[in-house]
A protein has these predicted regions:
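Residue-level signal for well-ordered alpha-helical positions
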Residues: 50-51, 147, 181
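Short, flexible active-site loop motifs that bind/organize anionic cofactors or intermediates
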Residues: 34, 141, 175
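Acidic, glycine-rich loop-and-beta core segments that form the ion-binding/anion-interacting portion
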Residues: 95-157
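Glycine-rich hexapeptide-repeat left-handed beta-helix
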Residues: 138, 152-293
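Short, solvent-exposed loop/turn positions at domain surfaces
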Residues: 86-88, 106, 123, 174, ...
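Terminal amphipathic alpha-helical/low-complexity segments used for targeting or macromolecular assembly
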Residues: 1-85, 89-90, 238-239, 244, ...
Length: 293
């Protein structure tokens, strides 16, 4: 079975050549049709950002170039609403009962769910935002997916990042190319880096729990479900923090330079460790091989 995904190369940053190839472009092969086996968190990143948001943008550009009526409809809607083309309701779809400050900037293609609050100074570009989400002042969202019930306090920054439902990314925290699980808290002033300062290949955990080359010059990290991360942490690229982990910045561990397992969680040293329940134990008894394409 051969499926033509109709890929096209799209750049998302022009950077110095030491961060990319000789052309200085960071690019993805973006398919117009999507088919992907998900074995690890890196595949979730690819599915949401590359096969999801980038592909939606590529399909929009293709239709805009080939369909004159579509182009005229968008232009007419923008003129009627008195908005820029990328801000018109044809490209920015907003659900019911939303409260959006007029000083927020939202560029499409963007989809916003029901009961969403977006405050002044927020900038949102090409994102998918679920229901019951709170986006506070000066939040920056670009090419990101935000799940239902998430809370983003002021000056949170997400770039090419997936945040699953009921999670909170506290103020002045920056996540780039990351995946965050459900019911997780990440404290204020934390930074998730995505680039090796020396040109060593980036490796991430694969579906079998082994370190494999990520085949990307830049990539962020993964935080599991039901995690509690304190303020002021710095996380190196491609690190994995398992579900149910609690991390508190300390003299011993403020910079996360290794993958963190549940057994390494800080809450085991707390006075009442039983107050943080383990909700997502690994299914180690299932020893069958992962099916993959």
């Amino acid at each position: 079975l051969v499926i033509d995904l109709e890929p096209r190369e799209l750049g998302y940053y022009h950077v110095p050549t030491y961060m990319a190839d000789q052309s200085g472009d960071l690019t993805f092969q973006v398919p117009l049709r999507s088919l992907l086996a998900i074995d690890s968190w890196v595949h979730i990143f690819i599915a949401d950002v590359v096969f999801g948001l980038f592909s939606r943008g590529a399909r929009f550009e293709k239709q805009l170039n080939e369909d004159l009526l579509f182009k005229l409809r968008i232009l007419g809607k923008a003129l009627y609403e008195g908005r820029q083309i990328l801000e018109c309701s044809e490209l920015v779809q907003i659900g019911r009962n939303c409260i959006i400050d007029p000083h927020a900037i939202i560029h499409g293609p963007t989809t916003i769910g029901d009961n969403v609050t977006i405050n002044a100074g927020a900038v949102i570009e090409n994102c998918i935002i679920g229901n019951n989400v709170n986006v506070s002042q000066d939040v920056q969202l670009m090419l990101s997916v935000v799940g239902d019930g998430a809370f983003l306090p002021f000056k949170t920054g997400l770039f090419m990042t997936t945040v699953m439902e009921n999670s909170m990314i506290a103020q002045n925290t920056c996540l780039q190319m990351c995946v965050v699980g459900r019911n997780t808290f990440i404290g204020a002033g934390s930074t998730f880096t995505d680039y090796n300062l020396v040109p060593a290949p980036i490796r991430a955990v694969d579906g079998h729990g082994n370190l494999s080359y990520a085949n990307r010059p830049v990539i962020g990290s993964a935080v599991g479900h039901n995690c509690r991360l304190g303020s002021g942490l710095i996380v190196y690229p491609a690190r994995t923090i398992e579900s149910d982990v609690v991390l508190a910045a300390s003299k011993e561990r403020r910079v996360i330079d290794k993958n963190v397992r549940y057994e390494d969680s800080d809450h085991h040293k707390f006075k009442f460790p039983g107050l943080h329940k383990r909700l997502y134990p690994p299914k180690r008894e299932e020893s069958q091989e992962l099916e993959s394409w």
